[in-house]
Each structure stands twice: as structure tokens, then as C-alpha cells.
Curated annotation (Swiss-Prot):
The keyword Hydrolase applies. Its EC number is 3.4.21.-. Belongs to the peptidase S8 family. Residues 1-19 form the signal peptide. GO terms for molecular function: serine-type endopeptidase activity. The active site is at 157 (charge relay system), 188 (charge relay system), 343 (charge relay system). Residues 35-113 form the Inhibitor I9 domain. Pfam families: Inhibitor_I9, Peptidase_S8. This is Subtilisin-like serine protease Pen ch 13.0101. It comes from Penicillium rubens. Disulfide bonds: none annotated. Residues 20-115 form a propeptide. The lineage of its organism: Eukaryota, Fungi, Dikarya, Ascomycota, Pezizomycotina. One of its GO terms (biological process) is proteolysis.
Length: 397
């Protein structure tokens, strides 16, 4: 259940064809047939973007390429200047659209899957105690009473059981890009949200939580759905005001996607801190997205003895480690569950980001650097080229 991964490996590399605008997968197992993500050039205006979509619709209709159910341009997104849209085309139509000088690139859509001081004694999960201590073996979580107050947490995942007592009425439903069922039928999203901001199990116990459902009950979704969820969260944050107190967690991923990485970069540029799971394949995290997005804070999983978890991804794109093995947190239906994975590690960091925003006023853009600055060099035998930094909330600094 940890880091939710693409069902089959794909897009291990991206080849560029047709004037560098149409990206193709070297391994097509996870590619959704006739589904694309179209990304526009940075200098395309909103008006030009609208005109392009009308033109693309006409091209699709004129060429009579609807015989296989392709419907042409679909939902569009504008994430802090990143403009694009999802589309259902056949490959020839996609090539025609890619020839428009306004188009930066087109890539196939793919499947992704579901990644005053207060002392809380006898914590229900060892991870909480570990992040407020510079040594292993502690059993209390020590934190400032601000506890993420005034910060909004966006859980981009399978949804959140907003009625769970661990959220104390602080969790709200945001959007659902998957289905018409505004519940967490999987449990992964509730668990990660609880780790970040639950009253009992979480780091930032006073933060507001918003459910952004991009994965279904089976834990699967699409890159385009993830981008749509990010787009919604950016717009929601802007509607709440530009105070910079927003964090997002994406404990999910798939193979490398330029579109997902570009969306992640623009989430951060918009003023939202972004924590992402490194992945659970025991391989270099640079092969997956959004873990490989440079602007995101990419998190590997540690064990209770400060080891690098056997399953965790690694490499230079990892910013730091956080507790990710045998983590207990809330689960739909009022109970709890113990899970392992980088999916469990990432929300610890999202929670600390919210905590530091409330306590120190750190900005979203500087939060990852501040977290790394506070982290201890505690991980033993980290894989070559991977940081040994372990999450620490800085309570005794």
C-alpha cells in the first residue's frame, strides 16, 4: 500500500519526434490509448490558448477522426502560467496538433497509482517521536503549540475520510477528478492526510485539510488527473489569499513524465510547498514523476533504526529521509492501520512544512531548504549518491 505506482513500467525514456513536440513512450504498457496531454509554449496568452483549443477541435472534427471514440480536446489547465489540456486524439491528429507553433510538446497520458511546546506521550506511531528528537528510541512527540495553525494541507491522493475523528472537523472535501464518489474508498489518502495533520497521528495538528481526489478506490488514476488536481488546488489557494501558507502532498507516481514534472514545478512557483514520495522500487527516483521534479521536496523512507528502508527509491533527487516503515495513522471507518512506504514518509515532511510555516513564517518556496537545514545526518548506509539527512522539526534548535 505505500507508494502507489504505475501498473506497468513505461516511459523509461522519452523520445522526441516531429520537431521536438510529440513525446513518445519507449515502453507503452501504461500508456492510455488515444489519450494525450498537450502543453503550450510559455509565451502563449490566455486568448491564444482559447483560440488554439477551438482550432484543435476543428482539426479533429474536420479530419473525421472520431470513429474510435476520440472526442478531441478535453479539460484544460493553467497552473501558474503552465497552460495545457487533455485530449482524446488518434496519433495522426496528435501529430497535426503538434505542428502548431504554439504547442510546446504533447505526451501520451499514462496510468498512475497510489506514495509553547507540547509533548505527546506514548505516541501511536514511532515516526512522530523520531522527527522531534535527534536520536532513536524516544517515545514522545515534542512540538510547538502553533502546530500548523492557519496552514492549508492539500492531499492529492485517493480522497480523505473527512468524518474521521482524527481530523476533528478540520478536513473538507475539495475536488474529485476521478468519479462521483466523494469518499476515500481506498484508505491511502486518509492515512497520508492523518500522518501530515491528524490530531492523534499527525505532525501539524491544527492545519486545515482539503481532499483532492485523483486516484480511485483501486488506487489508480492518470497523469492528466493528477495535473487537474494540482490545477484545482492552485486555484483554490489563490482564492483563499496569497499568504503563502499552503502545502501539498502527492504520495503517488509513475514513470517519468515531463508534463507532471512541469505541473509540479508550477505548483511550487505558485506558492504551495510540494512534498512527493520517492517511490518503493529500490531504484533511482530520477526515473519517476513527480519524484524527479527538481522543485518538489522528494522524500525517501527510513526505518525505526535510522536505516534506509529496503524498498525506498534513492539518488541525487532525494532531498531527505523521513519515517516510512510501519507507520500507524487513521484509516476510513474510524480506525487506524499500519502501513509502510515512501507514501508514509512524504506526509511527515508536508506536516513539518506546515508546522514551520505557522511557527517561523517560512515561505513555500524556501520550506524544503529550511527542512533540509534542520535535518540531522542520521541515516546509516544510505545508497551511494543519496543524502543521509533525516527529518527533524527543530524543536530543540
Amino acid at each position: 500500500m505505500g507508494f502507489l505506482k504505475v501498473l506497468a513500467t513505461s516511459l523509461a525514456t522519452l523520445a522526441v519526434v516531429d520537431a521536438g513536440t510529440l513525446l513518445t513512450a519507449s515502453n507503452t504498457d501504461a500508456v492510455i490509448p488515444s489519450s494525450y496531454i498537450v502543453v503550450m509554449n510559455d509565451d502563449v496568452s490566455t486568448a491564444e490558448f482559447s483560440t488554439h483549443r477551438e482550432w484543435a477541435t476543428n482539426v479533429h472534427a474536420r479530419l473525421s477522426r472520431r470513429k474510435n471514440g476520440e472526442t478531441g480536446p478535453g479539460k484544460h489547465f493553467e497552473i501558474n502560467g503552465l497552460k495545457g489540456y487533455t485530449a482524446s486524439f488518434d496519433e495522426n491528429t496528435a501529430k497535426d496538433i503538434a505542428n502548431d507553433p504554439a504547442v510546446k510538446y504533447i505526451e501520451p497520458d499514462m496510468i498512475v497509482n497510489a506514495t509553547a511546546n507540547v509533548v505527546q506521550s506514548n505516541v501511536p506511531s514511532w515516526g512522530l517521536a523520531r522527527i522531534s528528537s535527534k536520536r532513536t528510541g524516544t517515545t514522545s512527540y515534542t512540538y510547538d503549540s502553533t502546530a500548523g495553525e492557519g496552514v492549508v494541507f492539500y492531499g492529492v491522493d485517493t480522497g480523505i475520510d473527512i468524518s474521521h475523528s482524527d481530523f476533528g472537523g478540520r478536513a473538507k472535501w475539495g475536488t474529485n477528478v476521478v468519479d462521483n464518489d466523494n469518499t476515500d474508498g481506498n484508505g491511502h489518502g486518509t492515512h497520508t492526510a492523518s500522518t501530515a495533520a491528524g490530531s492523534k497521528y499527525g505532525v501539524a495538528k491544527k492545519a486545515t485539510l482539503v481532499a483532492v481526489k485523483v486516484l480511485g478506490a483501486d488506487g489508480s488514476g492518470t497523469n492528466s488527473g493528477v495535473i487537474s488536481g494540482m490545477d484545482w488546488a492552485v486555484k483554490d489557494a489563490k482564492s483563499r489569499g496569497a499568504n503563502g501558507k499552503y502545502v501539498m502532498n502527492t504520495s503517488l507516481g509513475g514513470e517519468f513524465s515531463k508534463a507532471v514534472n512541469d505541473a509540479a514545478a508550477n505548483v511550487v512557483k505558485s506558492g504551495i510547498f510540494l512534498s512527493v514520495a520517492a517511490g518503493n522500487e529500490a531504484e533511482n527516483a530520477s526515473n519517476s514523476s513527480p519524484a524527479s521534479a527538481a522543485e518538489a521536496c522528494t522524500i525517501a523512507a527510513s526505518t525505526s533504526t535510522d536505516g534506509s528502508a529496503s524498498f525506498t527509491n534513492f539518488g541525487s533527487v532525494v532531498d531527505l529521509y523521513a519515517p516510512g516503515q510501519s507507520i500507524t495513522a487513521a484509516y476510513p471507518g474510524g480506525g487506524s492501520k499500519t502501513l509502510s512506504g515512501t507514501s508514509m514518509a512524504a506526509p511527515h515532511v508536508a506536516g513539518v512544512a506546515a508546522y514551520l510555516m505557522a511557527l517561523e513564517g517560512v515561505s513555500a518556496g524556501n520550506a524544503c531548504a529550511r527542512i533540509v537545514q534542520l535535518a540531522t545526518s542520521s541515516i546509516s548506509r544510505a545508497p551511494s549518491g543519496t543524502t543521509s539527512k533525516l527529518l527533524y522539526n527543530g524543536i530543540n534548535v
